Design a protein with these regions (language model features):
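Conserved ABC ATPase signature
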Residues: 161-165
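Helix N-cap at the start of a conserved alpha-helix in ABC-type nucleotide-binding domains
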Residues: 197-199
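The feature captures the beta-strand-to-loop junction immediately N-terminal to the Walker
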Residues: 34-36
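Catalytic Walker B motif of ABC-type/P-loop ATPase nucleotide-binding domains
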Residues: 186-190
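H-loop/switch region of ABC-family ATPase nucleotide-binding domains
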Residues: 221-223
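Helix-to-loop junction immediately C-terminal to a conserved catalytic motif
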Residues: 49
Length: 266
């Protein structure tokens, strides 16, 4: 699934939050978005997800769906989550996210706590998401088993409302719910925030594996340069809403470039 950004601009008062003339995120990329506070990372994600309206420009999702399926039905799902259906001939589509909601069927995201239904327990929330995606109880349990180390015995079966959880555990619930949608586009804003080192390493492994298994397009923003370099095939550096650097990181060559950019002079 490609994400194609053209002439995208968003201002708040006299401040330009995003100003991107042309950016294409290619199908199957695991793209890391980095930049200082106020660089426009979260605003860009909100524009892609149509949570806020752009002043000018478009965000489009382009890909293919199987003949006879709805626009939002997925072509691939992760191993051990859902069985793959026979794949008829693909039909191409090109959707403007601001003018249709079809893209939401294959898009998972966690941007902040407002995405959660906090009067539910984690178990209830996952069951709710499972019903939305026609995921059986057996398939849900298989999904949760893949996240057992990530949950660290603090979420499943605990009967605690999401609103009472720590910031780190809320983060875990949001990430897992986004991935439970079996998305072909996955967008996570600061997924390493509030997580302990074990959980950070676990989610790095899970994201890389999900990308490899499904070919999903994954966008991750983070202030943690090391984690971003570890998982991303491509890294985009934003500053004042503009793309300053666009780095091929398939050989992890972005580390030195980013360290030099963010270096503090003595």
């Amino acid at each position: 699934m490609e994400i194609i950004i053209k002439a995208l601009k968003k201002t708040f008062g006299d401040k330009t939050a995003v100003d991107i003339p042309d950016l294409t995120i290619h199908s199957g990329e695991l793209l890391g978005l980095v930049g200082n506070n106020g660089a426009g990372k979260s605003t860009l994600f909100r524009l892609i997800l149509d949570l806020i309206k752009a002043d000018t420009g478009t965000v489009r999702m382009k890909g293919a769906r199987s003949n006879g399926q709805g626009a939002g039905e997925h072509q691939q799902t992760p191993t051990n989550l859902l069985p793959l259906a026979p794949c008829p001939s693909p039909l191409e589509f090109d959707l403007n996210v601001a003018t249709t909601e079809d893209w939401k069927d294959w898009t998972g995201a966690f941007v902040d706590e407002s995405f959660l239904i906090d009067y539910l327990t984690p178990d209830e929330y996952f069951q709710f998401i499972a019903r939305l995606t026609d995921t059986s109880d057996e398939q849900l349990q298989e999904f949760l088993a893949r996240f057992q180390h990530f949950m660290a015995d603090e979420l499943a079966g605990q009967k605690k409302l999401i609103r009472t959880l720590s910031a780190g555990n809320k983060q875990k619930v949001g990430i897992m719910a986004a991935m439970l949608l079996h998305p072909q586009v996955l967008i996570l804003d600061e997924p390493f925030n509030f997580l302990d080192p074990s959980s950070q390493n676990a989610i790095k492994h899970l994201l890389k594996k999900y990308n490899e298994e499904t070919g999903a397009t994954i966008l991750v923003s983070s202030h943690n340069l090391q984690h971003t370099v570890d998982i991303s095939s491509r890294i985009v550096l934003l500053e004042h809403g503009q793309v300053i650097k666009d780095i091929d990181n398939r050989e992890h060559q972005a580390q030195s470039i980013l360290e030099n950019y963010f270096e503090i002079d003595d």
